[in-house]
Amino acid sequence: MASGSRATPTRSPSSARPAAPRHQHHHSQSSGGSTSRAGGGGGGGGGGGGGAAAAESVSKAVAQYTLDARLHAVFEQSGASGRSFDYTQSLRASPTPSSEQQIAAYLSRIQRGGHIQPFGCTLAVADDSSFRLLAYSENTADLLDLSPHHSVPSLDSSAVPPPVSLGADARLLFAPSSAVLLERAFAAREISLLNPLWIHSRVSSKPFYAILHRIDVGVVIDLEPARTEDPALSIAGAVQSQKLAVRAISRLQALPGGDVKLLCDTVVEYVRELTGYDRVMVYRFHEDEHGEVVAESRRNNLEPYIGLHYPATDIPQASRFLFRQNRVRMIADCHAAPVRVIQDPALTQPLCLVGSTLRSPHGCHAQYMANMGSIASLVMAVIISSGGDDDHNISRGSIPSAMKLWGLVVCHHTSPRCIPFPLRYACEFLMQAFGLQLNMELQLAHQLSEKHILRTQTLLCDMLLRDSPTGIVTQSPSIMDLVKCDGAALYYHGKYYPLGVTPTEVQIKDIIEWLTMCHGDSTGLSTDSLADAGYPGAAALGDAVSGMAVAYITPSDYLFWFRSHTAKEIKWGGAKHHPEDKDDGQRMHPRSSFKAFLEVVKSRSLPWENAEMDAIHSLQLILRDSFRDSAEGTSNSKAIVNGQVQLGELELRGIDELSSVAREMVRLIETATVPIFAVDTDGCINGWNAKVAELTGLSVEEAMGKSLVNDLIFKESEETVNKLLSRALRGDEDKNVEIKLKTFGPEQSKGPIFVIVNACSSRDYTKNIVGVCFVGQDVTGQKVVMDKFINIQGDYKAIVHNPNPLIPPIFASDENTCCSEWNTAMEKLTGWSRGEVVGKLLVGEVFGNCCRLKGPDALTKFMIVLHNAIGGQDCEKFPFSFFDKNGKYVQALLTANTRSRMDGEAIGAFCFLQIASPELQQAFEIQRHHEKKCYARMKELAYIYQEIKNPLNGIRFTNSLLEMTDLKDDQRQFLETSTACEKQMSKIVKDASLQSIEDGSLVLEKGEFSLGSVMNAVVSQVMIQLRERDLQLIRDIPDEIKEASAYGDQYRIQQVLCDFLLSMVRFAPAENGWVEIQVRPNIKQNSDGTDTMLFLFRFACPGEGLPPEIVQDMFSNSRWTTQEGIGLSICRKILKLMGGEVQYIRESERSFFHIVLELPQPQQAASRGTS
């Protein structure tokens, strides 16, 4: 369909149809019950399927390469044998695997075809000082007027046409001035950024656009005849093209957001207006690789293609790869005979023409275009970001690997048409801007999708807190609110709980029997057609139930979602093998390619989307754990919610890292040479560093407590600051905002202070927002300078080149975007001297070739800002980053202002750069380093948290097996200790919520237990360290303790006692060291006449024991400096929740923990119904 790229006649009857039946199994991934949908994401929150999706995409691409190669081979063989290519028969033939040689030959034919289009000529030149000719097209001599039989007027009547021959110096083919341009271009780091060069033939002085790019063996020069001999066209033409693009881009940017269709409709209108083609379309690739025309602008008498769908093979994978390398592809005349490229026999393979603007279309594609009535075409790639970044890829001919081909803008013309390179260059800029705008719209849609996923996760947790599993269908919200469906059902313990439009109970039992027989080895199934999935009773269900998603919870419990019949009308470009189709299917005819017929899909529902299946999968995982724990006799689902949803343990381990970050940041803020201040939630100052005090004349003591809005800023900044505060307190952080601060005391006479600030939300350790911090940069000096510049006050050149450090980096542009000023500060910042850049194009040469940018999108954004400024539209604080001469990455804010004569006529633009100070950059770098380190730790902990569950299940299972064997008394005691330790660890993993411990809402699971078993479990957990450190363990535990029973949360008590004891073991002196355990029971009589058991624990060691900072951390509620201290602090709080308390006591010769724990007696607890 996209005629500029089609390289095979491929037409797949089944490989890419959106209406194809979709049903997928859910295959078991681990013994723990984790599952993932084949081909989809299996993550609990909708985000776990990225890797699977990428793998599936690669798999599809590989499969399509194979099919492309097979059909290409059939087409080539038919041409060689003189037989016509039987289009229909080739499609119907059973697919046979293509050999590696066949695929390699196919790719070589596409990328190294050895022919070009005749509207220009191609040279390949050695990339060295010799400029040796490695290859040339057969028409080179004719186009350059170098053939001996040519009689063309020449500036030099004695000139003799130099021969076009392999090994000759390519510079001799062109005028001396053109040769100099080529030499300069060959020396450039990124040669493609200089395109097009304006060069002339040596003999006739005929002008050409020279489009250069590097390949593996040298430099390819595509020469396209130009239409005028104006020597200024080299610059003026490029600038005019940019202006055309910027004008269209400005109209795109003015469109309202949130409407991708309007954006696409506008693009096709602009492109048709720019290029004059008969038809312009936006062609979008769907996830299954098939294409759809989503927007169209055409001549009135042409047949519309809007809404047509085309198979994935219509745009072969090889062509898609070419579009990623060369974003714009023009075919001037599909009937024109291709021109052969003659190359040096020493070259080991045909010349690579991937980046050539003249590369000839494949014969099959030319036939395809002719059959459909399209003689000329222009196809442009629409590239969007798929995540990630690429700091080094800046060539216009290539793109970062993190980018993906979203679709194409396709232009068709019914007669030969060739548009000049500068206009194609403008279209390329427009496509880059379209991709950026489209990317923002898609990101917005993605954010809305993420919000929906978060709402779904909340819904899952709410469901899990229900008292009974049946609550998910009997209460509101129910499982029908989870995904879009017409009905849902739960089959639980042999009972059927339906909601909405569902099968009858007899039918559901029949479906379960079918699932068990045909899909018993899976953990679920999703299909948009039960009939196509093979269910024999589908006809009896009728249109009411067509699609179904099912999740297996246990071998006998199921969750179902149902969708009713939806008739889908699919217009498909290229008729499928329809029995009534009498058209000639043996050739690539427009009837078989473009006259779409209506296909009504019956007995099929809307497909189940990946996000919907992720939500179903999450509920399946949680309910499976819930049902399993219910079977084991544990409590309701709340513990599972804490274990699955809240990763509180990550907070515990991460606080140590964050504390060090906080200490370092406080030091940096206090000593920073940039203004930094902070406010609380009421907008009152609670932070004011030395630099802002110096600038404003207001000391730290005087500033504390003052209102930022009412006391410290000018009235014109009030609205801005109020908005900043409001957004930051909600978590929305704004950057690069200018505010105007008042001055006080001696500084007051100097006038206001202008500061560019970033607003950062300040959070406490529980992640609650408690204020706002402003990190600023004083731009008062730059502000004064810019005002003088804009108003042409004084001698601006004296200001530009003043070495005063207050003068910011400044450069200027003339009306043609050529650099006209480059001050001392710019020389120091970039490493490029004024003489090296003045007179060069700022877009492409200065920024692009000298100062490298991150990629083509960055170049496009800079071009838009510069042209807007020249046109009278100023830009402030535009983020602008580049690499200096030494490769150092520079981040700045660009302000561009119109440069005008006294009469108001615009003659260019002044550009100012604002650079963060080294101290602030260092602070941010330290912060980024620590945040990266913390994030890495968090990922490690998340991995450990998830993976520790499987071995725990193994230990539990092994213990259960041992319990069923004949054991001796001591062996049974060992088993009881092992089981107690395993259950303690399981509880820590499940109930990892620090917040519930902090606010006292932790649910204690109380029951009767043996204190002797607790002490055995506690001691067992420290024995290895005791032995490793060669410490003596002294046990002072009365026999009555060993036999005593108590009532409480056994495993939390174990956790607390073990942590305190282990701390003594860690810090006991190694030489002649010992650790003592002393336990004393007491009976406490209460005022209500009841008795409680009072247990006194003492864990002691000789010497000082714990370091002071750990003891301090243990009794702190918010500030911690050690990991051990955090653990002890948490245990102290758990102990307090259980009614106990702890003291740490240092005596002259020993140190010890003194722990008091009061517990009810089991009999009295039972009589009171304590829970």
Swiss-Prot record:
Cystine residue pairs: none
All copies of domain GAF, residue ranges: 259-442
Instruction: Give the matching PROSITE patterns.
Output: HIS_KIN, PAS, PHYTOCHROME_1, PHYTOCHROME_2
Give residue spans, biased composition: Low complexity: 1-19
Annotated stretches, region: Disordered: 1-53
Q: Name one GO molecular function term.
A: protein homodimerization activity
Give one Pfam family, short name only. PAS
Describe the location of the PAS domain by residue ranges: 661-732, 795-866
- Gly residues bias locations: 38-52
Mind telling me which Gene3D superfamilies this protein's record contains?
1.10.287.130, 3.30.450.270, 3.30.450.40, Histidine kinase-like ATPase, C-terminal domain, PAS domain
What functional role does this protein have?
Answer: Regulatory photoreceptor which exists in two forms that are reversibly interconvertible by light: the Pr form that absorbs maximally in the red region of the spectrum and the Pfr form that absorbs maximally in the far-red region. Photoconversion of Pr to Pfr induces an array of morphogenic responses, whereas reconversion of Pfr to Pr cancels the induction of those responses. Pfr controls the expression of a number of nuclear genes including those encoding the small subunit of ribulose-bisphosphate carboxylase, chlorophyll A/B binding protein, protochlorophyllide reductase, rRNA, etc.
Q: How does it assemble?
A: Homodimer.
Protein's name according to its UniProt entry: Phytochrome B
